[in-house]
């Protein structure tokens, strides 16, 4: 039974993870490609907002290991984990480890800032976010600056995340990528009471519709809608 596995990461969470990562990379690429790709950059922004809403709701209503309560710990618990993090023989975490949980929150906050400021930004020539008319020119300029600079922090956070994956794979012999593909971890690591019984797909569908509805509402209530808005 050494090959037996138990479900830890639900399908909606896994789909979120990989679509979210794709949106971040694609947003960077379309921004660098410039004018001809800006409309796609904006569509990616809409998608990202929807994904953020989904993840926050899923953090309260999703299965066990998707919930914030399962991986947000007191500072003392985080410090205890950090102290033993460089031990090759440390027991792998079932869900997000305490440091990984902090990374989840950091990425949500950084990308929320990025997507939120994008709604107000302008290139002062052609393109402007749908909520740009709601703020003054100076405020729009400030938010555009934040939008541009904040992505540097996102890149740094992504780099740290990738470095952690490599560290766990090479130093601690823990593969964090494969379980995020199929959702399972060895039964020797995951007690039966810690595993999830299903991915709660019907609930995920409802949450997805709420997230999509929020994005629709947000754009429908923008002060001005034109062909060149975010």
Language-model features, listed with the residues they occupy:
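Membrane-embedded alpha-helical bundles that constitute the cytochrome b-like, heme-associated redox core
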Residues: 1-230
């Amino acid at each position: 039974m050494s090959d037996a596995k138990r479900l830890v990461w639900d399908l909606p969470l896994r789909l979120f993870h990989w679509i979210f990562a794709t949106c971040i990379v694609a947003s960077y690429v379309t921004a660098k490609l410039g004018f001809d790709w800006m409309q796609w950059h904006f569509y990616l922004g809409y998608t990202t907002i929807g994904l953020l809403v989904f993840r926050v709701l899923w953090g309260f209503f999703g299965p066990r290991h998707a919930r914030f309560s399962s991986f947000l710990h007191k500072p003392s618990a985080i410090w205890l984990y950090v102290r033993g993090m460089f031990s090759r023989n440390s027991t792998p975490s079932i869900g997000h480890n305490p440091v990984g949980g902090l990374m989840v929150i950091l990425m949500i906050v950084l990308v929320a800032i990025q997507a939120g400021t994008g709604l107000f930004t302008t290139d002062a020539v052609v393109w402007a976010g749908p909520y740009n008319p709601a703020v003054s020119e100076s405020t729009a300029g400030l938010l555009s600056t934040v939008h541009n600079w904040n992505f540097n922090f996102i890149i740094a956070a992504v780099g740290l995340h990738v470095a952690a994956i490599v560290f766990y794979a090479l130093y601690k012999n823990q593969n964090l990528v494969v379980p995020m593909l199929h959702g399972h971890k060895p039964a020797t690591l995951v007690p039966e009471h810690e595993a999830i019984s299903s991915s709660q797909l019907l609930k995920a569908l409802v949450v997805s519709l709420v997230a999509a509805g929020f994005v629709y509402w947000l754009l429908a209530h923008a002060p001005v809608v034109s062909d060149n808005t975010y």
